[in-house]
């Protein structure tokens, strides 16, 4: 019987250690504690409608156009080359006779009688 009472004693001590609140006021309602911080209030976010602004345009600035001064270049001349002038040799070409078109050949050239 000593082992039975010892096991019951160990059971109760372990129950007190393992259960955090133990056997304290199990059946009572917990005491009211006011909240430490205020609860958040859900307000709809107030967004202003977008305001249409025209694009910003800077006024035109009157600046004179930049003109480059004209550049005077001397005319390009090839350097003189010291070569004797070459004369073209005359080429003799016999005058070309064109054959008659849409005509009968002359009688002396005609071999058909």
UniProtKB/Swiss-Prot annotation:
Region (Disordered): 29-113
Gene Ontology cellular component list: extracellular region
Biased composition (Basic and acidic residues): 45-60, 67-113
Phenotype when changing residue 87 to R: In strain: cv. Coerula W2
InterPro entries: Proline-rich_CW_protein
Highest taxon listed in the record's lineage: Eukaryota
Tissue: Expressed only in young nodules.
Chief localization: secreted
GO process terms (BP): nodulation
Key words of the record: Cell wall, Nodulation, Repeat, Secreted, Signal
Signal peptide: 1-24
Start and end residues of each stretch annotated as 15 X 5 AA approximate tandem repeats of P-P-[QVHRTA]-[NHKE]-[KEDT]: 34-109
Subcellular location: Secreted, Cell wall
Sequence ranges of Pro residues compositional bias: 32-42
Sequence repeat ranges, renumbered to this chain: 34-38, 39-43, 44-48, 49-53, 54-58, 59-63, 64-68, 69-73, 74-78, 79-83, 84-88, 89-93, 94-98, 99-103, 105-109
Function as written in the Swiss-Prot or TrEMBL entry: Involved in the infection process during the plant-rhizobium interaction.
Protein family (similarity comment): Belongs to the plant proline-rich protein superfamily. ENOD12 family.
Protein name: Early nodulin-12B
Source species of the chain: Medicago sativa (Alfalfa)
Gene that specifies this protein: ENOD12B
